[in-house]
């Protein structure tokens, strides 16, 4: 029984220049699939049959640029050879990862000199990272190999198929019972009229009860206020016959007058009957003021809070106004200082040279000498700022002229 293994060997451009290295890599690949049996080039013989190894060699740059087109879902293994040891030179672009994922079969492996700092990109592409022992030349001595990462393309999981149950069809022998809608009995006209009469009677009784309750409430109010008013201001008792229906109404002015007259006796009608709002006492709250006044405050706390807020705002406005005034004054002072400095600079005495100072100097003429009197002798006798530096010594009778000497001064 024969089977085939398709292997793609991706080589770095630097590896292609060494033909012996490429042949060694190929021989190692054939040996790894030998399984300790006979090997003839690309064919491996096992106990169960022969295995044909189809090895395809490509340069990774050509595959990345799309110069060479490879079949999808074809290769069992893809081996990448990169001689660079530094991780920054082993980076694989994401587009190449996706292409390798498409070239591999399910459960196919991508191994070799892989980068170690791109695990997130590998997982996002769809690979599974596994560890595998690296093959060494010392495997003949039964030494354990170094663990390296291998990218495996997972086997796709088949989605479970859910079968829908069919509706049961009734046979001809079975009889189906259909549920009918509920039936309601229709009322006669006599019953409707009787029900309307009952409803009207109930409404009449309810109205009578409400009127009786209102009358009782009025009577209690009248008895409450008339109990104190039966004694007149003269001390005479009013009889029940003298009290009419109009006299039962109480005037507010009479109550106020009555209250003022009875203040001297230690009691008043308004103080006993009326309920005045209680002021907020700070001592009852442990000496602490309430955080905020009530929504419907009537004790005056809300007005006090508004007054405090307005006082604080006025104080802040005063402070800000003073700061603004001081800032403007400082700015005015700074501007005045700058103006004074500019005026002082303008008033400084400017150095002006006369025509004799700006005229050309001839040291060969008697009486025309420099400040040191030795400029005509040469550079050895000239000062650092002498305009004749670099010129040879002057000869008697030689005319020396300097162009633009006045501009330098």
Curated annotation (Swiss-Prot):
GO terms for cellular component: cytoplasm; mitochondrial intermembrane space
Binding site for [2Fe-2S] cluster: 280, 294, 297, 299
InterPro entries xrefs: Anamorsin, CIAPIN1, Dre2_N
Localization annotation: Cytoplasm; Mitochondrion intermembrane space
Cited Pfam families: CIAPIN1, DRE2_N
Binding-site residues, [4Fe-4S] cluster: 372, 375, 383, 386
Keyword field contains Kinase: no
Short motif Cx2C motif 1, span: 372-375
Domain notes: The C-terminal domain binds 2 Fe-S clusters but is otherwise mostly in an intrinsically disordered conformation.
Family the UniProt entry places it in: Belongs to the anamorsin family.
Name the UniProt record assigns to this protein: Fe-S cluster assembly protein DRE2
Gene behind this protein: DRE2
């Amino acid at each position: 029984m024969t089977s085939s293994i398709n292997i793609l060997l991706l080589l770095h451009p630097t590896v292609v220049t060494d033909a012996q290295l490429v042949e060694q890599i190929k021989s190692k690949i054939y040996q790894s699939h030998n399984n300790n049996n006979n090997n003839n080039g690309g064919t491996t013989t096992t106990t169960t049959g022969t295995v044909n190894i189809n090895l395809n060699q490509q340069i990774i740059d050509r595959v990345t640029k799309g110069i060479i087109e490879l079949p999808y879902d074809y290769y069992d293994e893809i081996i990448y050879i990169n001689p660079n040891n530094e991780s920054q030179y082993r980076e694989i672009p994401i587009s190449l990862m996706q292409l390798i994922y498409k070239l591999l079969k399910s459960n196919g492996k991508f191994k070799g000199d892989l980068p170690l700092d791109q695990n997130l990109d590998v997982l996002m592409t769809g690979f599974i990272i596994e560890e595998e022992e690296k093959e060494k030349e010392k495997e003949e001595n039964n030494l354990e190999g170094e663990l390296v990462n291998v990218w495996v393309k997972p086997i796709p999981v088949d989605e479970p198929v859910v079968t829908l149950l069919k509706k049961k069809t009734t046979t001809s022998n079975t009889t189906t019972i259909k549920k009918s809608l509920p039936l309601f009995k229709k009322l006669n006209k006599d019953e409707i009229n009787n029900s309307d009469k009952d409803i009207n009677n109930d409404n009449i009784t309810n109205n009578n009860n409400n009127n009786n309750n209102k009358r009782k409430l009025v009577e209690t109010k009248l008895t409450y206020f008339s109990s104190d008013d039966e004694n007149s201001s003269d001390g005479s008792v009013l009889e029940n016959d003298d009290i009419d229906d109009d006299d039962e109404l109480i005037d507010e002015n009479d109550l106020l007058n009555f209250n003022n007259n009875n203040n001297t006796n230690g009691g008043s009608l308004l103080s006993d009957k009326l309920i005045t709002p209680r002021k907020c006492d700070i001592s009852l709250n442990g000496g602490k003021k309430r955080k905020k006044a009530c929504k419907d405050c009537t004790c005056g706390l809300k007005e006090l809070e508004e007054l405090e807020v307005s006082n604080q705002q006025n104080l802040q406005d005063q402070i800000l106004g003073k700061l603004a005034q001081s800032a403007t004054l400082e700015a005015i002072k700074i501007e005045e200082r700058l103006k004074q400095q500019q005026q002082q600079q303008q008033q400084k005495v400017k150095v002006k040279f006369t025509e004799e100072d700006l005229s050309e100097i001839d040291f060969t003429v008697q009486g025309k000498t420099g400040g040191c009197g030795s400029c005509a002798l040469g550079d050895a006798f000239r000062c650092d700022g002498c305009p004749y530096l670099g010129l040879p010594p002057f000869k008697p009778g030689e005319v020396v002229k300097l162009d633009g000497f006045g501009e330098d001064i």
